[in-house]
Amino acid sequence: MAQYTVDSFIVELGFSEKVVKGLQRVEKMSMQAAQRIERNINKAFDVKPNKSSQEALNRIVKNAQSASGRINKALNSSFNLDSQGVKSLKKLETQAKKTAKGINKSLKDAMKVDGKITIKTGRGRGGQSIPPVGGGAPRGQRVDVAQRQMERMFNNNFYSGLTRRLETIGGQGNQMAASFRGSLQNIYNRYKGTGKVGEYEMEVKKLIDVTKRWVIAENARLKSVKESAWLQDRANASLRQLVGGFVSAYALLELSQKTIEAGVKRQSAQLASTAIFGADTQQARMFAASFAHQIGQNYTDTMKQYSNFAAGAQPTLGFQGTQEFYKNAAMFARIRGATDEDLKGIMVAFQQMASKGKIQAEELRGQLGDRLAGAVQLFADAIGKTPQELDKLMKDGKLLAQDVLPKVSERMAELVKQAGGMNAVSKQTATSMGQAKAMWDNTLVALFNNSSEGISQLSNSVAMFLQGSMGSTQALGLVIGNLLKGAGNLLDFVTDFMYRTSALYYYARAWYKDLDNSQQKLIKSAGEFLGTVVTIGGAVAVVSKSVKLLSGLVGGGIFGKILQRLGVSAAGTAAAGEAAAAAGGVTATRMALGTVGSALMLRGSTDPNAAKNYSEVTLPKPFENAVANITNPKRPMFFDENGQLQFAQYTQDVEGNRKLIDNGLSNWEIIMEKLSTSIDNFANKFNQTPMMMTPSGLPMQTKQTLNVTFNLDGKQIATKMVDITDKNQEDILLSSSYPEEE
């Protein structure tokens, strides 16, 4: 790429040699045109700020435009260019026009107040000054003009878009912006008053280039951080959506439950009010609705309390008296700071007083006094007695409800009025909160009223279903009962079986210990003793009739302990055990493929891990590792535009460094590898597979299949099917002529 200087800008072109020569001619012609323009301008004349000066300026602009046109014409006539060349030359033309405009602007800026104009001299290639027409020294640039140019450049760069971009990056960006402005200020101070605009501009460009490179690098880093954060957030999107789905479903269930509860309570309160107030039901409901809103209580609770209180107090106080008493008592309780629960207890105490007909210390000092401070003094002031006199009246049974309660109602009304009345009650925070709760309860009741028909139909359908399935339920109960009976019989049978096994074991031990050392040494290698031991095995099989039980006992090491304590090694006893079993009167059996043959039985009995393989029932979560690997934020996943699950190609270590993931496995292979390992471990430990017996007496293993489906974000991402086989405990069928007990 050749570089050619044209005036004060650099153009990089990749043309052929012919194009380069043409550009050289263009450069020469441009310089000649510029020199002609400068010679015309540098003529010594005075320009007045009038019509003639404007005409002179117009001529300058016209000459510059004419020069630009000649440049374009010379280029087009010198050679033919392709589209790229035309674009480059158009750019060159644009720069020439820009130069002409700059000349015009410089002329306007250089005009003095008295109309004098000082023109800047041009510079040729290599920085050589072009002498003005008429001789004399070259004219230098005025310092004040250069200073104004530097000031404009300084202000533009100081508040440029670059500094604003730096300030949006963050803490480091703000520091970089401050550093940039400080460096810019230092450069300006260094060149201030020197008139070296070109050098100043180059220094500023260097500073801007360095700052821009930092901005580009920082933007790349921030983009990487955002992408990593997005991928990590997307990796756990399925779990959050799953939890969110459960929360939404639970919230909907809770809303349905609360709706039904609120609706049923409202229906119950309405029904009770009808039964208690009779013809005055509508008036009572209107009072309850209005008063509940005033004191910030739920309408259902107010209606229920009012109805219950009226049931006991209405015969004594009448409808109007009951309403006034309830109103005064509720407002008085609110002023004394009673909560909704306290208000319920207070009204229950007043109800009991009214229904019993007498005021007793149990209600006044206990139930009412615990919830309403100053209750005793309230009653004493109402009837004009002292607390001691009040106690005596209650003790004598002379404090009647029909005489006392109306006076208490009047006293409570006086105290409420002194405290500010209903206005004071409505301004309490508890009242506002209660009103909000009441509106929510009304909303739930509205939901219930619109859905009550559907709820009733569903409830009836459920009841009919349960009634219709009663026979099936009874049959299921019989099945469960039979299973439990079988389990009980099995435990009883196992107990008897253990007694028999223990007897055979101790019999063999006692018989062996009665022998002397030489006889014991002979017996160790004899098939007779082995036959006795295997006879025990045959007896066990005949008695138990349970293959799993025999396998468990073998795994538990009962026969292994017999051989170990008798000093008989398990190695090399397979064939001897089979022969000894036949010699001992035990028919050799066909063993199922697996670990429970006659020889493998002995070997498994001496294996310390045999019992563990059989008896381990505390299995780990079989898919915990697979799920943890899939949802690991170190291994983020996402769905591509085709809806396929993909792994991110990069991960992040504990230090925050990005690493490329490339282990040679595809995404599905990684999932299946982890999933298969977990499922295989689960299948290996799930070794108690049920067996079926054919009519010929041979064991036939039933197949069990474990189907596992993984869903992520509502999409099925993997399906795994595993056949669970019993690799450790296979059923055996032993046939033995075990003598029955006499």
Swiss-Prot record:
Keywords, alphabetical: Coiled coil, Viral release from host cell, Viral tail assembly
InterPro entries: Tape_meas_N
Protein's UniProt keywords contain Coiled coil: yes
Pfam family, one: TMP_3
Region Disordered: start-end pairs: 120-140
Coiled coil found in the keyword field: yes
GO biological process: viral tail assembly
Functional note: Serves as a base for tail tube protein polymerization and acts as a template for tail length determination.
Family of the protein in this entry: Belongs to the Mulikevirus tape measure protein family.
Protein name as catalogued: Probable tape measure protein
